[in-house]
């Protein structure tokens, strides 16, 4: 079995890119696909902008994952959580005291010839393309999604009540317990369900907000990772960003 990375396309921009006078930095960070332990690792983190140190927090977790010496599906499922929690707490304690509440989301993938691992906390999203549709593989850790999952309110009722879709219930932080989701899709299941050519996308909420508004482009655009990335970026910038916006698009061939 052999995996070939055939295409990568990405963007990561500050919400105020077109209003430099506001001088707000981009608090998203990303892991551009890199080779690790006979597989490929890539991800996105979104620092919580309501606290000081949001950029530093998102950068730290991405840098930490990038620098893992050994990586395996078993490690991601059973060991990473506690190690990341301890190292993040140590990092925050080493910073200025005003960074004590710095927090971040993190969603990343590791793909090798055993399968696809998805490690996720917060509200970035991982999608996989099936025909001309994007299938969401992660669940948002938000109050909005929690109310939906428990069937307390319908989506229509939540919108009528103007419940925010961005209020997080979980994140990487020094003051709340880290409670991530982990998903594993075996190699053969990936091929059976999605074919020998798979496209995986990771987006921050500033990017998928505009995808949710209209979940389609032309068949040609949906069939091309670079065209899709460019089209979504144009849509965001034409409508006006509401948050920092980040996307990584990948295409792999599974032999």
Task: Give a label for each model feature.
Residues 1-255:
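PP2C/PPM-type serine/threonine phosphatase catalytic domain
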């Amino acid at each position: 079995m052999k995996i070939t990375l055939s295409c990568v396309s990405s963007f990561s921009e500050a919400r105020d890119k077109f209003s430099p006078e506001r001088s707000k930095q981009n608090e998203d960070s990303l892991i551009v696909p890199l080779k690790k332990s006979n597989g490929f690792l890539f991800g996105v983190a979104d620092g919580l902008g309501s606290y000081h140190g949001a950029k530093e927090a998102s950068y730290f977790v991405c840098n930490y994952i990038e620098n893992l010496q050994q990586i395996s599906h078993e490690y991601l499922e059973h060991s990473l959580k506690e190690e990341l929690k301890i190292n993040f707490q140590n990092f925050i304690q080493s910073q200025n005291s005003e960074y004590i509440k710095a927090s971040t989301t993190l969603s990343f993938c590791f793909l090798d010839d055993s399968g696809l691992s998805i490690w996720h906390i917060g509200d970035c999203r991982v999608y996989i393309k099936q025909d001309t549709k994007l299938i969401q593989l992660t669940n948002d850790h938000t109050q909005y999604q929690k109310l939906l999952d428990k069937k307390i309110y319908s989506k229509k009722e939540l919108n009528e009540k103007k419940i925010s879709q961005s209020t997080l219930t979980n994140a990487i932080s020094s003051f709340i317990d880290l409670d991530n989701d982990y998903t594993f899709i075996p190699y053969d299941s990936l091929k059976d369900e999605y074919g020998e050519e798979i496209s995986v996308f990771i987006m921050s909420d500033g990017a998928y907000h505009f995808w949710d508004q209209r979940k389609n482009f032309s068949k040609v655009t949906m069939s091309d990772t670079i065209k899709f990335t460019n089209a979504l970026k144009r849509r965001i910038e034409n409508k006006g960003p509401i948050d920092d916006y980040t996307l990584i698009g990948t295409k792999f061939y599974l032999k």
